[in-house]
Structures are given as C-alpha cells and as structure tokens.
C-alpha cells in the first residue's frame, strides 16, 4: 500500500518554494527524497496555477491529481470538466502512472453521484479516463458499476467521519463489493483523506492519502511511528496538561523522545519553535509509515462484517 502525502507543493514545501528555503539541510533532504519517490497528491483546485506546474515540472514530479472539487465547492468556486481535462492533457508529464493508469481522479459532483457519473462520461468523451470516485452514503449501484468496469477506483466523502462509523461503512463496502470470496481485492482502491492508521491497516487498500502531516504540524505536534502524535510546540495549550505534551512527560519518556529525534537528525528545540521543521519531520514519518505498511501489507480482507441498519 502506498501512503500519499497530500498538498506538499500547494503548501510550498518543495525545492524553490518559499517554505523550502526555511528548512535545514536535513529537512530539505527529506522533502527531496519525497519528490524522488513520488508519493504526493495534489488538488487541481490548488495547483492549477502555472507557478505550481512550473515548480513540479522543474523537480520532475509525478503526482496523483485530485480535482479538489470539495474545496472549490466550500469556497463557492465552480470547476469546469473541460478545463480539468485540458490541464491533465497539458501536464501529463507530471502525473503519476500506475501500470498504465494515469493517476488523476474524476471531477466530483459534490453531493450528487449522478453528476459525478456524468462528469466521468464527459471526461472520457474528451479523451481522458479518470479514476472514478464513489462517496460514502451514495447509492451502492454506482460502486457496483465502477467495480465491474474499472481497474482502479477511489473512495471519498470519508473526512470527518469517526473511525468507528467509518469502519462500519467500509466493512460493508469491502465485503459486499471490493473483495472476492477469498478476501482478495477485485480491483485497486484508493482511499481519499484516510488519517487513521487502523483504517489504513484494516483493509487491502492499494493506496491512501492524508494531509495529517501539515495539520498536525499546524497544531503544534509531530507524528511518531512509536507513540503516535505528540505535542511539542512551545505555544501549545497542552503544555499545562499533565501527560499531554512532551514537556510534561516523565523524564524517562522525555529522554526516549529526545533520543529518537536526535537519531533521525532533528532537535526538540527546533521542533518546538519552528512550524516548518515539524512539517518536515511529519513527512519523514510518512516515509517510515510507508515502509511499515509495505511490510505488513494485507492482501486479504478477513474481518467480520458489520451491517448498517
């Protein structure tokens, strides 16, 4: 399974961009390695501007492209299917390719599965076959159709749903439509906005993406492979809550964290004061997470199904 870091270019963390210049050599090394391996997802709504295209092309980027329809919808921006396809065709050289499938998803019709399907057809008529998207809560006949007719699909509409509720819905979708009788996935499936590691591990995803790296950094935290998210910012309100911040853990726990940070080229002092350093550290954690997921990769889905009533 591949874990994509979402919105790295649109947050200006790659070479030549304004946050990149604030990074140390070690932090730049991490971002450079991310670009070299390619697990980055960007939204057309944000990287449609030529400045982002130029930055990605200069670095020989190969990204997974999402339309960004939900973000545009919340801002009252109307996106054009024709313009989206034009962007994809003009910039095919910066898009990731998985076994002949160009990694660009359909322009969603927010809250309207029929419009999403119409957009799918229109994009195909314009000469590009995008990855279709099925959203949580939609008529499952759309999912049945996508599974029958496409080799790689996406699941969306899951952001903001609790892990418990998401597990109930995903158990149903995977068991009914996405795996065969032996528990093997019928097709490749990408999960948009998957932030919970238990959700990543529970199903045989081919890929997922998450923007937790930047969100966690913004809220003053770092993501660690061993202990999960830890608050480190000197401005974090959790500094005053026992056991909720690195500064108020036990001396033994603190030393374990400091030793780990030092071993991978980071300092607690810089992480506690520099937002960009936390973001770079979290990108490093994504790399570790990718390695862990590859080692634990589940090719079969063997969990008890919970029906929705």
Predicted regions and their residues:
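Acidic, divalent-metal-coordinating active-site segment for phosphoryl/phosphodiester hydrolysis
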Residues: 195-200, 204
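Non-catalytic, usually N-terminal nucleic-acid engagement modules in DNA/RNA processing proteins
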Residues: 1-118, 303-309
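C-terminal extensions of enzymes
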Residues: 1-35, 248-309
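Metal-ion/cofactor- or nucleotide/acyl-coenzyme-handling active-site neighborhoods
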Residues: 61, 204-271, 308
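Generic structural signal for well-ordered alpha-helices
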Residues: 52-53, 85-92, 117-121, 143, ...
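Glycine/Thr-rich beta-alpha phosphate-binding loop at enzyme active sites
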Residues: 129-192, 196, 212-236
């Amino acid at each position: 399974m591949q874990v994509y870091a979402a919105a790295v270019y649109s947050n200006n963390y790659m070479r030549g961009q304004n946050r990149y210049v604030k990074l140390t050599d070690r932090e730049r090394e991490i971002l450079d390695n991310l670009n070299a391996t390619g697990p980055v997802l960007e939204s057309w709504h944000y990287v449609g501007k030529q400045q982002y295209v130029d930055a990605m092309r200069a670095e020989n980027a190969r990204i997974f492209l999402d339309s960004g329809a939900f973000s545009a919808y919340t801002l009252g921006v109307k996106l054009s299917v024709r313009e989206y396809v034009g962007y994809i065709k003009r910039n095919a050289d910066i898009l990731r390719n998985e076994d002949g499938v160009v990694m660009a998803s359909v322009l969603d019709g927010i809250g309207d599965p029929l419009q999403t399907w119409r957009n799918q057809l229109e994009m195909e008529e314009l000469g590009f076959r995008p990855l279709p998207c099925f959203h949580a809560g939609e008529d499952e006949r759309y999912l049945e159709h996508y599974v029958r007719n496409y080799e790689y699909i996406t699941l969306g509409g899951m952001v903001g749903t609790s892990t418990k509720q998401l597990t109930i819905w995903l158990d149903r979708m995977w068991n009914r439509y996405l795996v065969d009788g032996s528990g093997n996935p019928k097709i490749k499936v990408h999960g948009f906005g998957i932030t919970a590691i238990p959700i990543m591990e529970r199903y045989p995803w081919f890929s997922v993406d998450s923007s937790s790296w930047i969100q966690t950094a913004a809220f003053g935290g770092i993501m660690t492979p061993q202990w999960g998210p830890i608050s480190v910012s000197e401005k974090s309100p959790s500094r005053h809550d026992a056991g909720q911040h690195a500064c108020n853990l036990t001396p033994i726990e603190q030393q374990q964290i400091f030793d780990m940070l030092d071993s991978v080229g980071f300092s607690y002092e810089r992480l506690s004061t520099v937002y960009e350093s936390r973001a770079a550290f979290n990108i490093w954690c994504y790399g570790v997470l990718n390695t862990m997921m590859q080692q634990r990769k589940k090719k079969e889905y063997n969990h008890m199904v919970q029906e929705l009533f």
